[in-house]
Amino acid sequence: MIDPTLLRNNLSEIAEKLKVRRGFILDVDKFSQLEEQRKTLQIKTETLQAERNSRSKTIGAAKARGEDISTLLAEVDHMGAELNTVKEELANVLTEIEQLALTIPNIPADEVPLGKDDSDNKEVFRWGTPKKFDFEVKDHVALGEILGGLDFAAGVKLSGARFAVIKGQIARMHRALAQFMLDLHTEQHGYTEAYVPYLVNHTTLYGTGQLPKFGEELFHIKPLENEQTYALIPTAEVPVTNLVRDEIIDEADLPIKMTAHTPCFRSEAGSYGRDTRGLIRMHQFDKVELVQIVEPEKSMEALEELTNQAEKVLQLLNLPYRKVLLCTGDMGFGATKTYDLEVWIPAQNTYREISSCSNMWDFQARRMQARCRAKGDKKTRLVHTLNGSGLAVGRTLVAILENYQNADGSITVPEVLRPYMNGIEIIGK
């Protein structure tokens, strides 16, 4: 959530900056109208409180003199009733302002390129050279069928479209990938591993910005009567980041760096007809998430570090990729700056997103009231939060199957994964 004070004091400037966000126009007139109502009611509340306090003192003095105070008491009671009414009106206006503020995306950083969609993203660099095959390249679906390791028909039978059953050595590689990523991030990159709930409450989803705007993209769990309403997590970013909600952190304890391997659940609303074949776009997929909680002045530096750590996974797996700086029209709702990592997919002859690494600035921290304080300082300030995929396990599996395929349909196991697969070098029939 954007700082309300910043909105009040720089409304026109903020509205102009947010015009570059795809599909969003800040309703300046509505916000201004609500803000005027807030000011009027705030002044009225303060005036009534002052008058009531003054009359209360008058009552005390009159009573001490033995005077009749019944009229004064009636006036104070009337003021009290009027004050309660005005307070209620003020609370309603403040709620409206907050609800409007919750729909406003984050302000893009100055260095983010202007653009309408992903065609305007800026490529930063490419790493690795796509392999030239001397045979007809198969996609991961065909390879999975040859090896008996990807069963989409079973996924449809058990659940429906955009589900799959992974079996045998391919399932083992899927597990190995997650273990490899976690070991890399905990042993070399300084992250603490977390095991978190896959079901979260709505307060948690508000904290990281999924609600109220993106409710249709979530799988909601209908509770029994009088029970808490839950949603399945769309990413481990949600529970892991919310661990610092309502906390005041000693700045000496920052940065906090946490990683988690979880399944992720997304309805893929708005994705009808896109990537209907294979593992690229599923309702359920695994991901290793990276989260950092940092001091405000260090968040841009932390974004570079976090992105480099996600890149390291691709480099160790020797998978060609490119790094892309997202434009204003393609960034996520809560991000101020985002890098996407896109891995080479031979059968599609293109790069596909495998990681998105974002600096959320104080956007989530304000929603969560996550603060930090320097030693000896009474004042607190909002932390900055960052997150990124390190990596999406299913898409990494797709990239390995296609980039490491052999002419007979077998798959060469990347060297860094072999210790996790009991030394297996080739996955064959």
From Swiss-Prot:
A molecular function annotated in GO for this UniProt entry is: ATP binding
| Keyword Electron transport listed | no
Q: Which GO terms describe its biological process?
A: selenocysteine biosynthetic process; seryl-tRNA aminoacylation
> What is the name of the protein in this document?
Serine--tRNA ligase
Name the family.
Belongs to the class-II aminoacyl-tRNA synthetase family. Type-1 seryl-tRNA synthetase subfamily.
Keywords in alphabetical order, please.
Answer: Aminoacyl-tRNA synthetase, ATP-binding, Cytoplasm, Ligase, Nucleotide-binding, Protein biosynthesis
Q: Write down the top EC class of this protein.
A: ligase
About its domains, the entry says: Consists of two distinct domains, a catalytic core and a N-terminal extension that is involved in tRNA binding.
Catalysed reaction(s)?
tRNA(Ser) + L-serine + ATP = L-seryl-tRNA(Ser) + AMP + diphosphate + H(+); tRNA(Sec) + L-serine + ATP = L-seryl-tRNA(Sec) + AMP + diphosphate + H(+)
Instruction: Kindly list the places in or outside the cell where this protein is found, as annotated in its UniProt entry.
Output: Cytoplasm
What does the UniProt function comment say about this protein?
Answer: Catalyzes the attachment of serine to tRNA(Ser). Is also able to aminoacylate tRNA(Sec) with serine, to form the misacylated tRNA L-seryl-tRNA(Sec), which will be further converted into selenocysteinyl-tRNA(Sec).
Task: Tell me which EC number(s) this protein carries.
Answer: 6.1.1.11
Q: Which gene encodes it?
A: serS
Binding of ATP occurs at: 266-268, 353-356
Kindly state the subunit structure of this protein: Homodimer. The tRNA molecule binds across the dimer.
